[in-house]
């Protein structure tokens, strides 16, 4: 299988190549096969992207918001028309099951474009009456914004970041993860087809040095990152030297709390969704599953039964429920955590190994894994693994589990399963996390903000809040009388 794009980069409305850049091979995670060969951006490529963005941004910002929104909504239509093609590309790029990419990737990107394209014309400033005189505020674009993506949801992340930025009148430069560089180029083509003026959405490929060059560029007004906490700290420090706006959507070790009155099958389904979807490579996953002692034994029994039925295999078989991890390095990292979990005394309830799959022996597969008898101090309960590894912990009462759930440097997400909605609201109100669910998990509609507390991030993706993060406020005071001056 091959998925070679026309060129590595997309700048000023056209594909651009510069083979002087460092080679960037693209690997299909299910087989280890190279499916494309790209090149990292050179300084010349980076400068060309900024020149194109600078040329286009002012005129774009001057358009009526409804006109900008119309182009975004047309882009959403194009993505939906091409959903199967884009989903197959995303499966090649990430290894995720086609069953998943058909509903969770380009489809979510289209939702974001449609939402921001529709809401931008109503996102206005304020009028303040001041007793004859008055003031008003304007929401204005920041200028050139940079997005740095992750490899778990490439096209979704590219759209979640670029849609609100473009809606507000900014230009956008996006660097995908070096592991998954392909679908951002497809998004660029969709923008072009929809009529987005050249230079407003640019894609530059590369490794960490390219990301650093974008962050440090004098024309960068804002940086939006989806990535790990260490990467976020580094980028925020770089951006802080020039006081640039930042949005950080980082890692997590989120709690999922199951009370003894919860619907057992629903809670197990939520826990599986919050640990095994995308082969566990989701930042908001509820990897610390706290189960009340009264139902712990039955919960684990049914969880193991259902987990063992997960179908692992060919990502392009729509019956497949779980594909491989993104890379050999990520697989080895996850396996090392499983080894550490066993060494520290956790009980391996199921999984923990590498499945034998005919035709995919060089792929980066791993079995969905459940640990029982996990304690709060174990490494697998403290550190983000980013793989299909669930830790089940026992609790006795509400106050106890709230305290333990909050005992983490992270605060991205949390979930509660209970038949008592009053208790559900109370517990969620005490949890220090930015994105929470009651009797559900990992549902992220674009209409609501997504982001975390503590080390899990700053700012928000999606919802009206995202528009605020891609804009700046200008206050205008209008004096209707004469100036009252003591001079």
Curated annotation (Swiss-Prot):
Name of this protein: Betaine aldehyde dehydrogenase
Family, as annotated: Belongs to the aldehyde dehydrogenase family.
Purpose of the protein: Involved in the biosynthesis of the osmoprotectant glycine betaine. Catalyzes the irreversible oxidation of betaine aldehyde to the corresponding acid.
GO molecular function list: betaine-aldehyde dehydrogenase (NAD+) activity; metal ion binding
Organism per entry: Brucella abortus (strain 2308)
Chemical reaction(s) catalysed: betaine aldehyde + NAD(+) + H2O = glycine betaine + NADH + 2 H(+)
Gene assigned in the entry: betB
Coiled-coil region list: none
PANTHER family, A to Z: ALDEHYDE DEHYDROGENASE-RELATED
InterPro entries (UniProt xref): Ald_DH/histidinol_DH, Ald_DH_C, Ald_DH_CS_CYS, Ald_DH_CS_GLU, Ald_DH_N, Aldehyde_DH_dom, BADH
Phylogenetic classification of the source organism: Bacteria, Pseudomonadati, Pseudomonadota, Alphaproteobacteria, Hyphomicrobiales
């Amino acid at each position: 299988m091959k998925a070679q794009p026309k060129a590595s980069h997309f700048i000023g409305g056209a594909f651009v190549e510069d083979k002087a850049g460092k080679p960037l091979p693209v690997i299909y995670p299910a087989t280890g096969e190279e499916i494309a060969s790209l090149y990292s951006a050179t300084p010349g490529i980076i400068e060309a992207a900024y020149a194109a963005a600078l040329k286009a941004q002012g005129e774009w910002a001057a358009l009526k918001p409804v006109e900008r929104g119309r182009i975004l909504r047309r882009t959403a239509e194009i993505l939906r028309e091409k959903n199967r093609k884009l989903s197959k590309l995303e499966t090649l790029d990430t290894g995720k099951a086609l069953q998943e990419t058909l509903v969770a990737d380009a489809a979510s990107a289209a939702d974001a474009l449609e939402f921001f394209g529709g809401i931008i014309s109503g996102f206005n400033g304020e009028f303040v009456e001041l007793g004859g005189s008055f003031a008003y505020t304007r929401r204005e674009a920041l200028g050139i914004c940079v997005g740095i993506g992750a490899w778990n949801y490439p096209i979704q992340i590219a759209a979640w970041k670029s849609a609100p930025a473009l809606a507000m009148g900014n230009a956008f430069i996006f660097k995908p993860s070096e592991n998954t560089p392909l679908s951002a180029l497809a998004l660029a083509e969709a923008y072009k087809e929809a009529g987005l003026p050249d230079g407003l959405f640019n894609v530059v490929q590369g490794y960490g040095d390219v990301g650093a060059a974008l962050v440090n560029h004098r024309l960068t007004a804002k940086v939006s990152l989806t990535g790990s906490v260490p990467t976020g700290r580094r980028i925020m420090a770089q951006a802080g030297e020039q006081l640039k706006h930042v949005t950080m959507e980082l890692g997590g070790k989120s709690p999922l709390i199951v009370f003894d009155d919860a619907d057992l099958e629903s809670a197990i389904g939520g826990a599986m969704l919050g640990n095994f979807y995308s082969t566990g490579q989701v930042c908001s996953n509820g990897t610390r599953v706290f189960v009340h002692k009264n139902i712990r034994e039955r919960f684990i029994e049914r969880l193991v039964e259902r987990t063992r039925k997960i179908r692992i295999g060919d990502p392009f078989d729509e019956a497949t429920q779980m594909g491989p991890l993104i890379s050999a390095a990520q697989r080895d990292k996850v396996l090392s955590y499983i080894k550490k979990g066993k060494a520290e005394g956790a009980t391996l309830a199921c999984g923990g190994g590498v499945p034998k799959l005919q035709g995919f022996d060089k792929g980066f597969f791993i079995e969905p894994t459940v640990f029982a008898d996990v304690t709060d101090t174990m490494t697998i309960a403290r550190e983000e693994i980013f793989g299909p590894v669930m830790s089940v912990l026992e609790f006795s009462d509400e106050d106890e589990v709230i305290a333990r759930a909050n005992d983490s440097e992270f605060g991205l997400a949390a979930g509660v399963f209970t038949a008592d909605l009053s208790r559900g609201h109370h517990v969620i109100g005490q949890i220090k996390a930015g994105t929470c669910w009651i009797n559900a998990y990992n549902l992220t509609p674009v209409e609501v903000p997504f982001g975390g507390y503590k080390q899990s991030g700053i700012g928000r993706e999606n919802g009206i809040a995202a528009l605020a993060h891609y804009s700046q406020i200008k206050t205008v005071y209008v004096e209707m009388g004469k100036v009252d001056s003591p001079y």
